[in-house]
A protein has these predicted regions:
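Gly/Ser-rich helix-loop-strand patches that form or flank binding pockets
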Residues: 25-28, 99-152, 236-278
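Short, flexible loop segments at the rims of nucleotide/cofactor-binding pockets, characterized by
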Residues: 12, 87-91, 120-125, 165-166, ...
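Small/aliphatic-rich secondary-structure junction motif
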Residues: 1-56, 139, 151-152, 156-221
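A short acidic, glycine-rich active-site loop
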Residues: 56-70
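Aromatic/hydrophobic pocket-lining residues that form π-stacking "cages" and hydrophobic walls in ligand
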Residues: 23, 76, 100, 205, ...
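Generic structural signal for helix capping and beta-alpha/helix-loop junctions
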Residues: 44, 97, 119-121, 154, ...
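Structural beta-alpha unit
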Residues: 1, 78-110, 211-244, 250-255, ...
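Amphipathic helical "hinge" segments at domain boundaries
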Residues: 68-80
């Protein structure tokens, strides 16, 4: 398996450039095509206007959306052409989760942005992106690579941390990330919890991964009262990982939020790219 078809999400977001560069890096490594999928936001009507919506307001927002689309198109096409990779432009008026879900099912991996966990103005979050990484991972049937909402994003895949708990979601993530794992300098296989249980969980999967020629280091992390997601991100930083691979747990983002899920913790505190799979 390899990544030969990559979809990158583009929207009203200054982080488009970071996602495009990450997609180009993967395309060069795997000989892939990159599809830039731009999702057109609907008019944003303030709630206090009720049913009365001035035509001028709608037209202004449509004009701004058109300008943003042209800007994103120019940036994507020129950057990919300059990099010499195969690429194409796609546009959709569907909500981001729906548009990406339909597109990525005929692709290998989707690259999306992490929503800002602490926006100064919640209305500034691009339409539909506040739930994007987690919901897409649960629905798409393909791996989803989430890019942090700030900070530099270097080339990924040299030092990878795999979060392992022996469950179906983690198994799916492990195999969906195999193209990256095979070319990594080091793979850190990490489980969080009691040592005895951790050793049992790591033993069989370690042997399996070594059969794929992976260079492995294993670790059992004591959360010491922290959330599991917080402990995993701390371990990733400690080991200078440039990518975290994990299962997208839960049946919905709401359920994850209610029960304080690992996925939600990771997505709200991530400082490096995270590959999610379900």
């Amino acid at each position: 398996m390899s990544y030969r078809d990559i979809v990158v999400h583009l929207t009203l977001d200054p982080r488009n450039a970071a996602r495009i560069q990450l997609a180009i890096g993967l395309a060069r490594r795997f000989g892939a095509r990159v599809s830039g999928l731009y999702t057109v936001p609907p008019p944003n009507v303030p709630y206090y206007m009720g049913e009365y919506i001035p035509t001028e307001l709608i037209q202004k927002q449509m004009d701004e959306a058109q300008k943003a689309s042209v800007s994103a198109h120019t940036e994507f096409m020129s950057t990919c052409a300059g990099a010499g990779i195969e690429h194409r432009w796609l546009s959709s008026e569907l909500a981001p989760v729906e548009a990406l879900r339909l597109t990525v099912r005929a692709s290998d991996i989707a690259i999306v942005g992490q929503p800002d966990p602490n926006p100064a103005d919640p209305s500034s979050i691009p339409y539909g992106t506040d739930v994007l990484p987690h919901e897409l991972a649960l629905q798409a049937g393909r791996p989803v690579l989430a890019v942090p909402h700030n900070g530099p994003v270097a080339e990924i895949g040299r030092r990878i941390l795999v979060a392992w708990n022996g469950k179906r979601e983690a198994t799916r993530a492990l195999h969906d990330a195999m193209p990256l794992l095979r070319s990594a300098e080091t793979v850190h296989l990490v489980t969080v919890g009691p040592e005895r249980k951790g050793r049992t969980m790591l033993a069989e999967v370690t042997e399996h991964m070594q059969r794929h020629g992976l260079r492995l280091e294993t670790a059992i992390v004591d959360p010491a009262g922290q959330k599991v997601g917080t402990a995993l991100m701390a371990e990733a930083q400690k080991r200078q990982a440039d990518l975290v691979v994990m299962g997208a747990f839960g049946h919905s983002r709401l359920r994850e939020m209610v029960f304080g899920g690992v996925t939600e913790t990771i997505l709200s505190s991530m400082s490096l790219p995270v590959l999610l799979s379900n």
